[in-house]
Amino acid sequence: MPDQLTVYNPATGEEIKTIPQQSATEVEEAIERSHQAFKTWSKTSANERTSLLKKWYELIVEHKEELADLITKENGKPYQEAVGEVLYGAGYIEWFAEEAKRVYGRTVPAPTTGKRIVVTRQPVGPVAAITPWNFPNAMITRKAAPALAAGCTFIIKPAPDTPLSAYELARLAYEAGIPKDVLQVVIGDGEEIGNVFTSSPKIRKITFTGSTPVGKILMKNSADTVKHVSMELGGHAPLIVDEDADIDLAVEQAMASKYRNAGQTCVCANRLIVHESIKDEFAAKLSEQVSKLKVGNGLEEGVNVGPIINKRGFEKIVSQIDDAVEKGAKVIAGGTYDRNDDKGCYFVNPTVLTDVDTSMNIMHEETFGPVAPIVTFSDIDEAIQLANDTPYGLAAYFFTENYRRGIYISENLEYGIIGWNDGGPSAVQAPFGGMKESGIGREGGSEGIEPYLETKYLSIGL
């Protein structure tokens, strides 16, 4: 492994910064520091942790422009989206700063008069987090905030494509007064660091956002030391548009869900399942809006869609489009690319496909790109079956004006997050997480602090 990691702008190929990488030994040293710091951090009062987290939140909001500029440079997403990410991520710190004071125990009626039973909650211990490149700021704060609020220490291993946001967040945390050994950042070989995290008995919890195959490896490797795990894994989100839907609303929300961050999110609508009676109108209106999107460098004025993060992601998107077209799909918008292998820059013009069927790879594989395949249905149970025909169960969307139909759809979709006439359901106040192979645990809401807490009960003999 090289001693240095160079970070590049995916929109221009320009070098942003070169940073040192950590060896396995250095990661083990970071774990030891985290272990020692836990002894004092876990004993701090909830009010003190609340105060420090609020200061961190305020500093992030104060520096939102610089943080957003950094996100756009290392990730490529449009600047305004990056500002939104910073504020969204900061919201988790603000939320869990308050939740730190709401970690309650309870007393339990004892089976005999000679006993008292008291239940308490305690931090689980040092936590290791592995975070993705698509939200290099918010996926850190969404994990760090509840961990620190609960009294855990925290080590972040960010994605090698986008590590700079992690270091800047840590710098602001230290400025807020959070001790350096309580919140640490390490970067290096992903497999090597993952193995150090999972094998160390001093790490008591692993939290990961990323692909399902990698999540499974982390879970297996964590079993030997019986770690707590939180996994926010892959998605393959359906978006159902029923025959009575408000088509203009469905198009507007599909645009927001599908093309945000160039389609590179785990909750992006990946399959548009549209009633056959309105397919033509929906497809025409969607294509009209897609054609208005501007592709380019996220720092340029008016850009809506930035680059694909790397060559591997680009080639997967192209292969899905090619496979669909070979099997009979029609490209009614986009379908063109701009690639520069010398600079490592890859752009996909937002694409809409019709005449899609289940023989095509795009119906079974997460795309992670700005491609909207439209498949039709005639009966709502057929739509639900299509939606559930996947091992994933993170997010789903549907559009109907019939409340009975809406309740029926929501109760039969096998997904942890569902948007009804809403293409952007994620919120700090709500529990984010998936079913089936899309993960374990929830982030956000009152549930978000639970994975970082142990339950202990004390039986007192009188």
UniProtKB/Swiss-Prot annotation:
<dbReference type="InterPro" id="IPR016160">
    <property type="entry name" value="Ald_DH_CS_CYS"/>
</dbReference>
<comment type="pathway">
    <text>Amino-acid degradation; 4-aminobutanoate degradation.</text>
</comment>
<dbReference type="InterPro" id="IPR016163">
    <property type="entry name" value="Ald_DH_C"/>
</dbReference>
<dbReference type="GO" id="GO:0004777">
    <property type="term" value="F:succinate-semialdehyde dehydrogenase (NAD+) activity"/>
</dbReference>
<feature type="binding site">
    <location>
        <begin position="210"/>
        <end position="211"/>
    </location>
    <ligand>
        <name>NADP(+)</name>
    </ligand>
</feature>
<dbReference type="GO" id="GO:0036243">
    <property type="term" value="F:succinate-semialdehyde dehydrogenase (NADP+) activity"/>
</dbReference>
<dbReference type="InterPro" id="IPR016161">
    <property type="entry name" value="Ald_DH/histidinol_DH"/>
</dbReference>
<feature type="active site" description="Nucleophile">
    <location>
        <position position="266"/>
    </location>
</feature>
<feature type="binding site">
    <location>
        <begin position="133"/>
        <end position="134"/>
    </location>
    <ligand>
        <name>NADP(+)</name>
    </ligand>
</feature>
<feature type="active site" description="Proton acceptor">
    <location>
        <position position="232"/>
    </location>
</feature>
<feature type="binding site">
    <location>
        <begin position="157"/>
        <end position="160"/>
    </location>
    <ligand>
        <name>NADP(+)</name>
    </ligand>
</feature>
<dbReference type="InterPro" id="IPR016162">
    <property type="entry name" value="Ald_DH_N"/>
</dbReference>
<feature type="binding site">
    <location>
        <position position="233"/>
    </location>
    <ligand>
        <name>NADP(+)</name>
    </ligand>
</feature>
<dbReference type="GO" id="GO:0009450">
    <property type="term" value="P:gamma-aminobutyric acid catabolic process"/>
</dbReference>
<protein>
    <recommendedName>
        <fullName>Succinate-semialdehyde dehydrogenase [NADP(+)]</fullName>
        <ecNumber>1.2.1.79</ecNumber>
    </recommendedName>
</protein>
<dbReference type="Pfam" id="PF00171">
    <property type="entry name" value="Aldedh"/>
</dbReference>
<comment type="function">
    <text>Catalyzes the NADP(+) dependent oxidation of succinate semialdehyde to succinate.</text>
</comment>
<keyword id="KW-0521">NADP</keyword>
<dbReference type="InterPro" id="IPR015590">
    <property type="entry name" value="Aldehyde_DH_dom"/>
</dbReference>
<dbReference type="InterPro" id="IPR050740">
    <property type="entry name" value="Aldehyde_DH_Superfamily"/>
</dbReference>
<feature type="binding site">
    <location>
        <position position="366"/>
    </location>
    <ligand>
        <name>NADP(+)</name>
    </ligand>
</feature>
<dbReference type="InterPro" id="IPR010102">
    <property type="entry name" value="Succ_semiAld_DH"/>
</dbReference>
<dbReference type="GO" id="GO:0006081">
    <property type="term" value="P:aldehyde metabolic process"/>
</dbReference>
<dbReference type="InterPro" id="IPR012394">
    <property type="entry name" value="Aldehyde_DH_NAD(P)"/>
</dbReference>
<comment type="similarity">
    <text>Belongs to the aldehyde dehydrogenase family.</text>
</comment>
<keyword id="KW-0560">Oxidoreductase</keyword>
